[in-house]
Amino acid sequence: MALGGTVNAQTASPQANDPHVISDQDMELLRKDIRSQKKQLMAANLKLTDAEATKFWPVYDRYTADLIKINDKKYGLIQEYADHWGTMTDEQASSFLRQWLDVDIAIAQLRQKYAPEVAQVLNGRKTATFFQLDRRISMMIDLQWASKLPIVQAQE
C-alpha cells in the first residue's frame, strides 16, 4: 500500500494553484484505489477459509459502505479546512474541531456496531486482526493527511 511518507506539520498555506493539490475527481479515484488495496490487504492477512470468506465479505462490504459515508464527511471537512485556512475565525476553528471529533466518534461507534457481527462470522483472533488492520490503515491515511495540512495556529 502506497501510504508511507514523512511527517511534517506544515505551516504554509495550501495553494489552490499548486500542481500537487488533488482534484475532487482524482480524490475519488484515489479513495477507490485505497479501498481496493485495503481489501487485498485484509484478504492477505486474514487468510480466510472459503466458508469464512462467504460469510465475512458481505459484512465487510456493508461496513465499508458505512465507513465511506463517514469518510465523505471527513474529506469534506478537510476540503473546508483547506478552503478557509488563513482566514479561519475562532468560531470556525471551534466548529471544525467539534465536527472532526464527531467524525472520530462516528468511526469508533461504527467499529463497535460491527464488532459483534464480524465476531459471528470469524473467530476471535481473526475478528481482532480485522479491526486492528482497519484501524492501522485508517491511522496511516490520517497521518498522510495530517502531514500535508498546515496547523490552525500557523495562520496568525
Where would I find each of the regions flagged by the language model?
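Sec/Tat signal peptide C-region and signal peptidase I cleavage site
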Residues: 3-9
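Hydrophobic transmembrane signal anchors and adjacent membrane-proximal interface regions, especially
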Residues: 9, 36-38, 141
